């Protein structure tokens, strides 16, 4: 799946394809989350559009996926998530620890392997 993420969107901000990514009010939290798509779901959607099966695939990400992306990973049949351990160290807070902990439970129950590199 990694090659598909490179062509997922022309916007470095994750704007949905065809949507302007230069509107200031769309770049500020929390509103920006209504206008963007995370890399994980972008990769899954692009695989679907290209007719590429994701069943049994591995997805490579910088940090633990959010719960929305994690559910998409499971539903897409992806069986392994590879995470950049060094980058994850930057996301240590009560909020992230709790959120990513729930994602780990979801992956464990769905039998999606997590590998930190």
Residue ranges: model-predicted function:
Residues 1-117:
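Zinc-dependent deaminase catalytic domain
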